[in-house]
Amino acid sequence: MTEQATNGAADEQQPQFSLQRIYLRDLSFESPKSPEIFRQEWNPSISLDLNTRQKQLDGDFYEVVLTVSVTVKNGEDTTAFIAEVQQAGIFLIKNLDPSSMSHTLGAFCPNILFPYAREALDNLVVRGSFPALMLSPVNFDALYAQEIARMQASGEIPTPSVQ
């Protein structure tokens, strides 16, 4: 009996991660040069912008929002379309040390959300009568590491010391 109680207490202290919900927070599409753009030869250039934000809801629940913005120009300066999606998720995250929590919110959760955002963007673009938008996978771990290095270099967060 005591062993079960001890195991139960130990289980409560184990790191926990659970996806609670994935949802579309915001979606927009603009094609400012329609219908003229459809009569032009298609020579696209793509600009992609990624952003994440997170906030603690209540207790151990966190909302992570991944914003993916795409601007496609035809030729040098004609904007074909602008599309943006805010894909969000609610995650239960417990018993992580601060470094692991930061990495989970900044890289792991966006990795989960990105395929949903990519699908929503592709659907928008096709419905706008443009060729499918095939976004490559994103390495959020590398982006997270770059952001941490940038913050350490600028003094926004201290550089960890080696003991």
UniProtKB/Swiss-Prot annotation:
It is found in: Cytoplasm. GO terms for biological process: protein folding; protein tetramerization; protein transport. This is Protein-export protein SecB. One of its GO terms (cellular component) is cytoplasm. GO terms for molecular function: unfolded protein binding. It comes from the Bacteria. One of the proteins required for the normal export of preproteins out of the cell cytoplasm. It is a molecular chaperone that binds to a subset of precursor proteins, maintaining them in a translocation-competent state. It also specifically binds to its receptor SecA. Its main location: cytoplasm.
